[in-house]
């Protein structure tokens, strides 16, 4: 088992399974959020969110392809401008994709391109509405995706810089 730091926000763990390396990064994030759901309220709500993400990339039996699994959970609490009402919400996002892989620069640069499916389930609850206090959310999308990974060594340790893009095509 080897451990590599990706940036400063996550730790990536690689397991050697049948000489195939599985990369897994887990991240926790806390930050600001803006919520505008005009079904529940015409007001924009601002607040805080907490998010957990697990991202796994592993090779398949087919040499040039890899499989990507991403799980993401989010909880949020936000208030309106008058600060007399709150909304709470939660989301779960699952992404599954297959990508074709290219290596460049002697294996230091790794490029991936492919497509997958993205599923989102969630809710928003307005604490003060009496008639329709909640809204459920669900979506299914076909998602082309790409990634670029640059591997390097610093301070005698392996590091990876990874950039990914997902663009909903249909759904």
Please describe what each predicted stretch is.
Residues 131-171:
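Outer-membrane beta-barrel transmembrane domain signature
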Residues 74-101:
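Surface-exposed loop and membrane-interface regions of Gram-negative outer-membrane beta-barrel proteins
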Residues 16-22, 57-67, 101-111, 153-161:
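Short loop/turn motifs that connect adjacent beta-strands in outer-membrane beta-barrel proteins
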Residues 50-60, 92-102, 115-119, 144-150, ...:
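Residues on the lipid-exposed face of transmembrane beta-strands in outer-membrane beta-barrel proteins
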């Amino acid at each position: 088992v080897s451990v590599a730091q990706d940036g400063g926000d996550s730790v990536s763990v690689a397991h050697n399974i049948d000489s195939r390396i599985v990369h897994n990064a887990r991240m926790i994030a806390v930050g600001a959020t803006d919520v505008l759901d005009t079904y529940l309220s015409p007001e924009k709500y601002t607040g805080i969110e907490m998010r957990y993400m697990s991202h796994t990339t592993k090779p398949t039996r087919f040499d040039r392809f890899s499989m990507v699994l991403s799980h993401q959970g989010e909880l949020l609490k936000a208030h309106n401008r008058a600060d007399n009402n709150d909304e709470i919400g939660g989301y779960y996002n699952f992404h599954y994709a297959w990508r074709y892989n290219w290596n460049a620069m002697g294996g230091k640069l790794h490029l991936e391109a492919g497509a997958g499916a993205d599923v989102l389930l969630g809710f928003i609850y307005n604490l003060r509405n009496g008639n329709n206090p909640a809204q459920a959310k669900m979506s299914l999308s076909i998602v082309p995706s790409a990634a670029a990974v640059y591997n390097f060594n610093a301070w005698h340790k392996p590091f990876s810089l990874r950039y990914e893009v997902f663009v909903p095509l249909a759904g």
